[in-house]
Amino acid sequence: MTKHLTLLLIMNSVFTQDHWETAVFANDEWRYLVPSSEPDTNWNEEYFDDSDWAQGPGGFGYGDGDDGTIIDQTLSVYFRTTFNVEEITKLTRAIISADYDDGFIAYLNGNEVARSYNLPEPSTFVPFDFATYYDHEASLYDGGLPESIVIDSLSLDSMLIDGPNVFAVQLHNVSI
């Protein structure tokens, strides 16, 4: 079976008092790194210089027809994108909708906010050459739904700032 590395829909929607706003769309431009060694420890933080990283539209994969950016097969890929927040005090929650193959860790401004079940427990360091414990297939391409991860306002208040913020994702495969 061919494995596909996908971030078809990592979408961070923020809920204000009277409406939803999408902060990161699935096909937004991302900076990404296919590592051959461990990236800098601050790669997922807002002030990290990612200008040497490659850039491409979201929907990363191996070229199965639904990818915005095609990459070579690898055990891991690191992604970053920025979004703006105005009036952080009005946010009540955020939702990350994730469709992925095989595992991921998501960060807001360097703070871990979500992790797939097939990686070591939350807040545990996962090296670039780590393979997930087992397979997880993306589901949107087959008519399924993405996973939803809710982040409450107390967590958002401690992670986000008014102005530019960074949403970063570390993606791992079960094998190459």
Q: Residue spans of the language-model regions?
A:
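Surface-exposed, low-complexity/disordered Ser/Thr/Gly/Pro/Asn-rich loops and linkers
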Residues: 46-82
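Extracellular Ig-like/FN3 beta-sandwich strand-entry sites
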Residues: 162-164
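Extracellular and analogous surface-interaction loops
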Residues: 80-90, 153-158
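Aromatic-lined ligand-binding clefts that engage carbohydrates, nucleic acids, or primary amines
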Residues: 30, 53, 83, 88-110, ...
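Sec-dependent N-terminal signal peptides
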Residues: 4-16
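Boundary/junction segments of secreted and surface-exposed precursor proteins
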Residues: 15-37
